[in-house]
Amino acid sequence: MAISKEEVLEYIGSLSVLELSELVKMFEKKFGVSATPTVVAGAAVAGGAAAESEEKTEFNVILADSGAEKIKVIKVVREITGLGLKEAKDATEKTPHVLKEGVNKEEAETIKKKLEEVGAKVEVK
């Protein structure tokens, strides 16, 4: 005589929590499966986004304000970007201005340091 699915469900429904836990362990052992829940896809995506933001490898160097020593800032901008005198002057007057795009963190910090030494305000994003 075969047992129906409904009879199995009735039997499982009549078990105590302890008996049900033992039954689950028996299923895991017999069939080589695990009853542990899997990670929710939404949580994995959110975690991945956080990891990406921590591992940013390309940065933009933005001249926020050229400060009082505009001539010194123009010289540094020319050195960093290779722009001509007029283009470098325009870049320092029209702030905020992106000086370098897609540079690594070390280069971005070096550029920021050089510009801040001559009085400019710089952002690295």
UniProtKB/Swiss-Prot annotation:
InterPro entries: Ribosomal_bL12 (IPR000206), Ribosomal_bL12_C (IPR013823), Ribosomal_bL12_C/ClpS-like (IPR014719), Ribosomal_bL12_oligo (IPR008932), Ribosomal_bL12_oligo_N_sf (IPR036235)
GO terms (BP aspect): translation
Gene3D superfamilies: 3.30.1390.10, Single helix bin
Keyword Chloroplast among record annotations: no
Molecular-function GO terms, alphabetical: mRNA binding; structural constituent of ribosome
Pfam families: Ribosomal_L12, Ribosomal_L12_N
CDD domains: Ribosomal_L7_L12 (cd00387)
Cellular component terms (Gene Ontology): cytosolic large ribosomal subunit
UniProt entry keywords in alphabetical sequence: Ribonucleoprotein, Ribosomal protein
Family: Belongs to the bacterial ribosomal protein bL12 family.
Its job: Forms part of the ribosomal stalk which helps the ribosome interact with GTP-bound translation factors. Is thus essential for accurate translation.
SUBUNIT field: Homodimer. Part of the ribosomal stalk of the 50S ribosomal subunit. Forms a multimeric L10(L12)X complex, where L10 forms an elongated spine to which 2 to 4 L12 dimers bind in a sequential fashion. Binds GTP-bound translation factors.
Name the record gives this protein: Large ribosomal subunit protein bL12
Lineage, top ranks: Bacteria, Pseudomonadati, Campylobacterota, Epsilonproteobacteria, Campylobacterales
